[in-house]
Amino acid sequence: MRLLIEQPRTMSSGSSNFLLVPIPEYPVLDCVPNKNVKIVVLGASNVGKTALIVRFLTKRFIGDYEANTGALYSRKINLDGEQVSLQVQDTPCVSLQDDADGLYCQEQINRSIYWADGYVLVFSITDLNSYRTIQPLYQHVRRIHPSGNIPVIIVGNKSDLLRARQVSDPEGKALADELGGLYFEASARENHESVQAAFLHLCQEVSRALGGGNGEKRKGGLHLARPKSPNMQELKRRFRQVLSSKVKSATAL
């Protein structure tokens, strides 16, 4: 059984780098000049990628999400005493395939991997198959970024569901050690602190990796624009919609 991800198309003759369809420009008026941290969250279906992002950015947990939206969220954060512009890219799921060769996911995921500076690889501790996607997914990231160290963390989400656990804490740590990152068990539902610790650690790793540069990578001479963001107003709108529907349901009872 292997992960199947659609392989990125290569650039025109004369270059061996991956060519990913240009990402639409995103308004930069609110960005902190020369201090940009770009993170992508990757993993299988139903592991809680969006829930982790929302929990980190808003401290709230929303149980209902539109699946596989692939939205990018942007906000300013304080990191080691400095204000930086953080962009967190949500992604559709990757999946295990029994009878296919290679790795499958939408081209959007390949673009996001190419664009990002740091990587959150997420599985659910209640889903062994989601855990098994992490190593081949990391290997795919390395194929897109073959040189140098890449900041990466492994997050075992849904740590509140201990009775349904299929992946032990030592197994998560062993995998993270093998891939050269840190392992965090987290609960998007019940523990904001665990989620915050994971994301802030990665932000610090990315900031150090950028080494005081301008935060904009040049890959093979190709400058990648920022993805379009629904911004925090859109995130708040979704939260109000979910809250309103729950209030109406309670009133109807």
From Swiss-Prot:
Region (Disordered): 213-233
A single GO BP: positive regulation of transcription by RNA polymerase I
Domain of life: Eukaryota
Classification via SMART domains: RAB, RAS, RHO
UniProt catalytic activity: GTP + H2O = GDP + phosphate + H(+)
Transport among keywords: no
SUPFAM superfamilies, alphabetized: P-loop containing nucleoside triphosphate hydrolases (SSF52540)
Matching Gene3D superfamilies: P-loop containing nucleotide triphosphate hydrolases
Protein localization: Nucleus, Nucleolus
One Pfam family named in its UniProt record: Ras
Main location group: nucleus
InterPro entries: P-loop_NTPase, Ras-related_GTPase, Small_GTP-bd, Small_GTPase
EC number: 3.6.5.2
PROSITE patterns, sorted: RAS
GO molecular function, one term: GTP binding
Gene Ontology CC terms, in alphabetical order: nucleolus
Binding-site list for GTP: 43-50, 90-97, 157-160
UniProtKB keywords: GTP-binding, Hydrolase, Nucleotide-binding, Nucleus, Transcription, Transcription regulation
Record-stated family: Belongs to the small GTPase superfamily. Ras family.
Record function comment: Regulator of rDNA transcription.
Protein name as catalogued: Ras-like protein family member 11A-like
Organism: Danio rerio (Zebrafish)
